[in-house]
Amino acid sequence: MAKKSTRTTPEDSQASTTDSAATSTASEATQAATSATDDQAEQTTAVDPTQQITDLKAQLDAKDDQLLRAQAEIVNMQNRNKKEQAALLKYDGQALAKDVLPVLDNLERALATPADDEAAQQLKKGVEMVYGHLQDALKKHGVTEVAAAGEKFDPNIHQAVQTVPVDDDHPADTVVQVLQRGYLLKDRTLRPAMVVVAQ
């Protein structure tokens, strides 16, 4: 068997030098990166562990405070919602009751009209029955008449439309006459009573 001759040409020599330079540059870059990582590690370990614990506790306390505030806000919203729902249920039907009040007024006017003959008296009895049933239905749902005649004037439930001088029968700030009845829905004024007040 013949031996192969190993001769180096100038091109081979130049390629070898280029490979060597590239390896050297890569090695230097790796050393620089390692050195930078070591510096960062030294800086990280240079931070005081006690300070880290203090910082973390402060962050934890801040998060706990945020959580407590959020929970308190949720509880407040739930309570507010319950109160609003209770008020809605309590005053349910307020609009309907207000709309029915003029009907009551008209029935009262019809009852105040004198009935001369028997047909009118029969009609009046029918109106009385309707009026009574309507009042019972309203009372059943918490609608009551405002106390007025002879009572002390209360601007929350009375509306003064006229004043008269004070006399022995009517002391100052008392209701002398009711011109239109007022009504309450539970503890809320549906319509104030229109009254004449002694002053």
From Swiss-Prot:
* Compositional bias segments (type: Low complexity): 11-46
Which GO molecular function entries does the Swiss-Prot or TrEMBL record give? Answer: adenyl-nucleotide exchange factor activity; protein homodimerization activity; protein-folding chaperone binding; unfolded protein binding
Keyword list (alphabetical) reads:
Chaperone, Cytoplasm, Stress response
Broad class of the protein's primary localization: cytoplasm
Known PROSITE patterns for this protein? Answer: GRPE
Region Disordered: start-end pairs: 1-50
Q: Which domain of life is it from?
A: Bacteria
Which Pfam families does the UniProt entry name for this protein?
A: GrpE (PF01025)
> What is any one GO biological process for this UniProt entry?
protein folding
Q: Which GO terms describe its cellular component?
A: cytoplasm
Classification via InterPro entries: GrpE, GrpE_coiled_coil, GrpE_head
Q: Where in the cell is it found?
A: Cytoplasm
| Keyword flag Transport | no
Under NCBIfam families, the record lists: PRK14140.1, PRK14162.1
Could you tell me what this protein does?
Participates actively in the response to hyperosmotic and heat shock by preventing the aggregation of stress-denatured proteins, in association with DnaK and GrpE. It is the nucleotide exchange factor for DnaK and may function as a thermosensor. Unfolded proteins bind initially to DnaJ; upon interaction with the DnaJ-bound protein, DnaK hydrolyzes its bound ATP, resulting in the formation of a stable complex. GrpE releases ADP from DnaK; ATP binding to DnaK triggers the release of the substrate protein, thus completing the reaction cycle.
Instruction: Describe, as the record does, how this protein assembles with itself and its partners.
Output: Homodimer.
Family membership, please give it: Belongs to the GrpE family.
What protein name does the entry list?
Protein GrpE
